């Protein structure tokens, strides 16, 4: 995949080169999307819209730390949707990991989460955040045990995962309604990079074959069910819906 690769002063150019090889990235100075290695972390920037700022993964501080400490905990919608209750913590495969937010919430509550991400730039950002999280004295010990990343397309990888998880979680990109200059900066940068997941309908069947207890699909409230298959149950929030499917 082509992206503009930049190394800020103080960062290690050798590390950027290794990163490019690992994720099979080629540098294109004309590309609108830039992957920037700073002394602190790896960032994604949209070069023609610098005001959007940088996207990066940070499990240690910022919004994710705040959500872990002060969020709804087991009362969070995603926790209820995957079936967390009492002492039960399902083993989860997050087949559309993105920046790992929902996976982190589940891991912080005690679930083991195996994340799949097929886009190499997104996988590189997620891996960078994970590696920094693994080194943190507070969250590192449980993060290493509970959150792992596999760079692969779920369309093919879901057939090979072993052992089978109790829950498969899907949150495919869905086109936003036009009104959204309101759409968060992150989604704008993301959609420039990966577009919408036009082949996401193909994930439902292999996910249902893999999960032993349930498949959970996160959808915007205005979106039709994935693959137009009616869910067996659903839970709703202000702007989203968690569709729940039984295994097949």
UniProtKB/Swiss-Prot annotation:
Coiled coil: none annotated. InterPro entries: 16SrRNA_methylTrfase_J, SAM-dependent_MTases_sf. It comes from the Bacteria. Keywords: Cytoplasm, Methyltransferase, rRNA processing, S-adenosyl-L-methionine, Transferase. It holds the Pfam family SAM_MT. One of its GO terms (molecular function) is rRNA (guanine-N2-)-methyltransferase activity. S-adenosyl-L-methionine binds at residues 101-102, 117-118, 153-154, 171. One of its GO terms (cellular component) is cytoplasm. Its main location: cytoplasm. It catalyses: guanosine(1516) in 16S rRNA + S-adenosyl-L-methionine = N(2)-methylguanosine(1516) in 16S rRNA + S-adenosyl-L-homocysteine + H(+). Its EC number is 2.1.1.242. SUPFAM superfamilies: S-adenosyl-L-methionine-dependent methyltransferases. It is found in: Cytoplasm. NCBIfam families: PRK10742.1. Belongs to the methyltransferase superfamily. RsmJ family. Specifically methylates the guanosine in position 1516 of 16S rRNA. This is Ribosomal RNA small subunit methyltransferase J. It comes from Serratia proteamaculans (strain 568).
């Amino acid at each position: 995949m082509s992206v503009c690769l930049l190394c800020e002063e103080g960062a290690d150019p050798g590390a950027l080169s290794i990163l490019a090889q690992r994720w099979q990235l080629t540098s294109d100075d004309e590309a609108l999307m830039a992957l920037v290695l700073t002394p602190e972390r790896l960032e994604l920037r949209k070069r023609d819209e610098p005001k959007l700022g940088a996207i990066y993964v940070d499990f240690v501080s910022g919004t994710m730390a705040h959500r872990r400490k002060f969020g709804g905990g087991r009362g969070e919608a995603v926790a209820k949707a995957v079936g967390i209750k009492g002492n039960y913590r399902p083993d989860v495969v997050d087949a559309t990991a993105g920046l790992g937010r929902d996976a982190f919430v589940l891991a912080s509550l005690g679930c083991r989460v195996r994340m799949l991400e097929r886009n190499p730039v997104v996988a590189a950002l997620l891996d960078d955040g994970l590696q920094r999280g693994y080194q943190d004295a507070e969250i590192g010990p449980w993060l290493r045990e509970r959150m792992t990343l596999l760079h692969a397309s779920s369309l093919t990888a879901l057939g090979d995962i072993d052992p089978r998880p109790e829950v498969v979680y899907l949150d495919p990109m869905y086109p936003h309604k036009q009104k959204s200059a309101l759409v968060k900066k992150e989604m704008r940068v993301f959609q420039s990079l990966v577009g919408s997941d036009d082949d996401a309908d193909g994930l439902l069947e292999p996910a249902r074959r893999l999960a032993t207890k349930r498949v959970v699909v996160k959808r915007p409230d205005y979106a039709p069910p994935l693959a137009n298959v009616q869910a067996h149950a659903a839970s709703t929030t202000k702007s989203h819906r968690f569709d729940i499917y039984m295994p097949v």
